[in-house]
Swiss-Prot record:
Interacts with FtsZ. It comes from Aromatoleum aromaticum (strain DSM 19018 / LMG 30748 / EbN1). It is found in: Cytoplasm. The gene is zapD. This is Cell division protein ZapD. Keywords: Cell cycle, Cell division, Cytoplasm, Septation. Belongs to the ZapD family.
């Protein structure tokens, strides 16, 4: 029997996880557009790289990732010689964490500083902040670059991205562990609303799963004390309205 389709929504409960989710989304977009050959694909990939530079530079991200990876490494080490856990799988996970940590520690200086020191790239970044600011008459050298062979452009983009790959690898491991940290619970939002007192739950992220056929979108407000979810009718023309009916959904309280 085929699994029923679901839409997953994730809501971070602290700034650190919020930053990791944003970066994960940006790295995925870069990978998508980097795979294309059209000048527009590589234009979007470059602008998205500038977004990664902006988001990653707001916090001491490298230190946070290294510390979290080390904490997870110690937890995994404590599972050694547990007959219920595969030693091979455990060794593989430890190796992956250790490699990611080593790559992060090898990153020198401020994240993305090499990009900030590239005057040509920073000129593009500056013009890109202006609506319609990267037309060929604004940046003829960029227009020339966009008309180069796709493989040459892709090589340049990969070179600019490569030093920031350790960030992507580190956050991928952390978010994977976070998502696998708990099991979903089935709940019912009566009259389209769901409220819960956290009661000491140390959740760092909420994950909601809904059937697309419900045609609703969750509006989530949460802190360490309580969560409030309102399921709104999916509207693209008028202001969303509360779905005044019972909505079945799954919720996962993810925490490392």
């Amino acid at each position: 029997m085929r699994a029923q389709p679901v839409i997953s929504y994730e809501y971070p409960l602290n700034e650190r996880i919020r930053t990791l989710l944003r970066l994960e989304d940006l790295y995925a977009k870069i990978a998508h557009f980097l795979g294309g050959d059209a000048p527009q694909d590589h234009h979007v990939a470059l602008l998205t790289l500038f977004e990664v530079l902006e988001v990653a530079g707001r916090a001491d991200l490298k230190v946070d990732l290294v510390q979290e990876l080390e904490r997870q490494r110690q937890i995994l080490i404590s599972f050694r010689h547990n007959p219920e856990i595969s030693e091979q799988a455990l060794s593989g996970a430890l190796y992956e964490i250790e490699q990611a940590s080593s790559s992060l520690l090898a990153m020198a200086g401020k994240i993305g500083q090499y990009l900030r020191e590239n005057e040509w790239l920073m000129a593009i970044r500056s013009r890109a902040s202006i609506p319609g600011g990267v037309c060929q008459f604004d940046l003829p050298s960029y227009h020339y670059w966009l008309n180069r062979d796709p493989e040459q452009r892709r090589g340049d983009l990969e070179g600019w991205l490569r030093p920031m790959i350790p960030i992507r690898e580190g956050l991928t491991i952390v978010l994977r562990l976070l998502r696998a940290s708990a099991q979903p619970e089935r709940q019912l939002a009566r009259g389209g609303t769901y409220q819960l007192t956290m009661g000491g739950r140390g959740a760092q992220m909420l994950q909601l799963r809904l059937a697309p056929a419900e045609a609703v979108v969750p509006e989530i407000s949460a802190n360490k004390y309580a969560i409030n979810i309102r399921f709104m009718l999916s509207e693209t023309v008028v202001r969303p309205r509360l779905a005044e009916r019972d909505i079945p959904f799954e919720i996962t309280f993810c925490s490392l």
